[in-house]
Amino acid sequence: MDRRISGSTQLLGLIGDPVAHSLSPAMHNAALAAMGEDYCYVPFPVAAERLAVAVAGLAAIGVRGFNVTIPHKQAILPLLSQVEARAAAVGAVNTVYALPEGGWGGTNTDIDGFVQPLLGLEKGIPTLILGSGGAARAAIQGCLELGLGPVRVAGRSPEKLRALQQTWPQVETLSWAELDRHLAETRLLVNTTPVGMHKPGSLAELSPLSWEQLRLLPAGATVYDLVYVPDPTPLLRMAAELGHTPIGGLEMLIHQGAKALSLWLGGKLVPVEVMRQAARQQLAQIGDPNS
C-alpha cells in the first residue's frame, strides 16, 4: 500500500528515552497500512527533563495519542487531565489519548496486553509473580482482574513490597528466600524481572529461577516471562523442557499495542496478526529492543 504522508495524515507516537530500537513503530504502522488508515506512528526521544514541554508540544501539533515508555510512565501522571482508575491503581500510564474537550487522558494497556495470553486459564489458580517493580504492578492488576489467586509477589526490595501491599492488601508479599515453599502449588509463574534479558554484557544466560526450583512447580504449570529477548528466554526453555506451558513477553507487547491502537481509532478492530508479524520481523533485524 502507498503510505504517502499528506497534510491530512494524523499523528500517533511513542515518547521515551531511548526509543530508537522500539518495536512499536513497526507494529503500529503495519497495522495502520493494513487498515487503510491515514495515520503515521512516530517515535519521539524525550529526555526526562523535557517531558512537560514535549507533552505540551504534542498537544499543540494535534497528535491524537501516544504511547509512553521508560522513564516516563509514572512521571507523566500529573501532566494528564484524567487518568483511568486501573492506571491510577498501578501508578503508571503507557497510553495517552486526546480528550474531546482538550487535554490528555491516560490509561494502562500494559494490563490488557498482560492478560490476553492468560484468558484461557481457570479462575482461582495460585499465582506467583517474581519482581516488585513497575511491570509487577501491571501483572498484579491483571491477575486480580482475571480472578486468579491467591496472588503472591516475591521481590528483593522490602520497601517496594510494602508499597505493593498498600495498594493491593489482598496480595501476599514474600522475600526472595521465601518463594521456594510456594512453588509446589503455583499454577501460574510470572517473571517481571529483567533477568534473562539479552543486552550487551548481560544476564542473557541467567534465569530468575533454577532448574531445581522449576521442577517444584506442579505438572503443566504456566510460566510467563515478560522478557522477550532472547526468544525463548532461559527460563522458558527450561520450563518447556520440564513440560510446563511457556508464554513469552512479546505477546504482551503486541496486545498492549493493539489495545492502544483500537482506542485511538475509536474502537476499531485491529489486525493483531499483522502487528505480530511486523514485530517479529523487526525483532529479527535489531535483536535488542528497548520497548
Curated annotation (Swiss-Prot):
Its EC number is 1.1.1.25. It catalyses: shikimate + NADP(+) = 3-dehydroshikimate + NADPH + H(+). One of its GO terms (biological process) is aromatic amino acid family biosynthetic process. One of its GO terms (molecular function) is NADP binding. The active site is at K73 (proton acceptor). Involved in the biosynthesis of the chorismate, which leads to the biosynthesis of aromatic amino acids. Catalyzes the reversible NADPH linked reduction of 3-dehydroshikimate (DHSA) to yield shikimate (SA). Homodimer. This is Shikimate dehydrogenase (NADP(+)). The gene is aroE.
